[in-house]
Amino acid sequence: GGIKPGVLGFTDEELQVLVSEAHHRGMRVACHARSAAAVKQAVRAGVNFIGHANYLDDEALALLEANRDHVFAGPAVAWEISFLEHYQSFGFETGSPEHEGYAAELKATQASVRRMRDAGVRVLVGGDYGLNITPHGTYARELQYFTDYFGFSPGEALQAATKHGGEAFMPDGRLGTLETGKIADMVIVKGNPLEQISLLQDADNIRAVIKDGQI
């Protein structure tokens, strides 16, 4: 059973009602959308955050670009990359359907993320954590994935995690950057992540965490 790949889980009318009702109640809407058809449906319905967006076609990219002022995308690649780094320890062989499937998906994701970035679509860090190979507390490694796999500079990866993440959660602009009058959420680190993004993965380099102005 289950839904076949490429088959949309909702009709356009169903999704539009869900999004409309959520927005009416002051909520923002996130969805999982891997195929180009799903991404296009989500953008047309007014979804705020699209998770994955692995397989974009030209029409899907054009829709994202046209709506880039109010839609965000997050590839959520930690699961894919972690699997590809450790698949043999899970009992899978090189060339197995699982290995080849995730490798192909990552290749498609790399192409889609680079296209979104070039089109000015805000691409976010995070997603699909809390699993055995993506435990909570390991989010910082995804910033390195953005530099290693998607061609982001360390500064661009940090911006995806902070400024753009803040804009996604609080469109009023109160979160995500260090400016007078904004929410004082920040991390003080030893070293310069603009020169070495991987230092954020070492807890010993985290000197202080400030939340709402409180250490």
Model-derived features with residue positions:
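His/Asp/Glu-enriched, well-ordered alpha-helical/loop segment
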Residues: 24, 94-97, 107-192
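Short, Lys/Arg- and Gly-enriched loop/turn segments at beta-strand edges
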Residues: 193-199
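Short aromatic-centered micro-motifs
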Residues: 209
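Generic structural signal for individual residues within well-ordered alpha-helical segments
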Residues: 16, 62, 158-159, 198
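Active-site core of metal-dependent hydrolases
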Residues: 1-107, 124, 129-131, 150-151, ...
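Short glycine-biased active-site loop of nucleotidyltransferases that positions the nucleotide triphosphate
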Residues: 42, 135-138, 198
